[in-house]
Amino acid sequence: MENRWQVMIVWQVDRMRIRTWKSLVKHHMYISRKAKGWFYRHHYESTHPRISSEVHIPPGDERLVITTYWGLHTGERDWHLGQGVSIEWRKRRYSTQVDPDLADQLIHLYYFDCFSESAIRKPSLGHIVSPRCEYQAGHNKVGSLQYLALAALTTPKKIKPPLPSVKKLTEDRWNKPQKTKGHRGSHTMNGH
């Protein structure tokens, strides 16, 4: 029998970002209780030796599974130390991989109060509307002018610690263009 390969998309992430994300997930599962129904699976509960943890997020009757890996092959950069994250959407026997933006939208849709475009219609129907969005990572586009005007009237409430964002977990913070200060800024940058 020949070997069969299965290819998965794994986002390379540095381990400190993974540790921060895990602690945010645990905080909102056990302390703030905003992540109701979420399930955290430790590395010792998995049979796969490379799985560091799994977070199961059930939006509706399906599941979003965020798996963190360790011991992967290192990448071409120094900080690619063999840590990674995969994001999978499962419903019964069907599963597919999703990108971090879609994962955040699914989490946002099912779990957190939001003052969104539908809030313009809801008060006229007699529904109660939340005056803010608790999970800003779930929005990836600019809203309508009505929405922006209503959002400008409400002051956003800062949540400490922030809610766990899958996009923030997988973003590449190392390859962004470096911002340097002007003439009066950092003296080490301009050689003085």
UniProtKB/Swiss-Prot annotation:
Coiled coil: none
Expression induction: Expressed late during infection in a Rev-dependent manner.
Residue ranges of the motif HCCH motif: 108-139
Ranges of biased composition (kind: Basic residues): 176-186
One GO term of the biological process aspect: viral life cycle
Amino-acid positions noted as binding Zn(2+) in the UniProt annotation, renumbered to this chain: 108, 114, 133, 139
Region (Interaction with host APOBEC3G): 40-44
Cell compartments where the protein resides: Host cytoplasm; Host cell membrane; Virion
Stated name of the protein: Virion infectivity factor
Source organism (scientific name): Human immunodeficiency virus type 1 group M subtype B (isolate RF/HAT3) (HIV-1)
Gene: vif
